[in-house]
Amino acid sequence: MGLGGYWSEVLDVLRDIIPVYDKVNSFISLGKDEEFRTRGLLGRVKEENAILDAGSGFGNMSKTASKLCGNDLKITLYDPLIPMLKNTKKFFEIPPALASGVFEHIPFQDEKFDAVICGY
């Protein structure tokens, strides 16, 4: 189930692109990454929601959600790469909770979150 034994290879590739992560996101979306995030979140995430940003990277989806809903969101960033999570707090007025792991083993109780978001 999931990536299993391939996780180490995937993590190696992701570590390599950390310095250019945001540029890659912009490039592969033809510069429409923020627009696509907004369209995906609009009307789906509401003020005071507890959200899990799964595979959060630098928290781009959560940053967009915060712009749309204000700072009343309770955000948890979840990513397998600790280096991606390390510098995220500086991007948020209210620092999000941070957790590291893979999707196959999400360590949260059922119904802890009002919404789970996942994007690039």
Named regions from a protein language model:
Residues V10, D33-R37, L81:
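Conserved donor sugar-nucleotide recognition element shared by glycan-biosynthetic enzymes
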Residues G119-Y120:
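Residues lining the SAM
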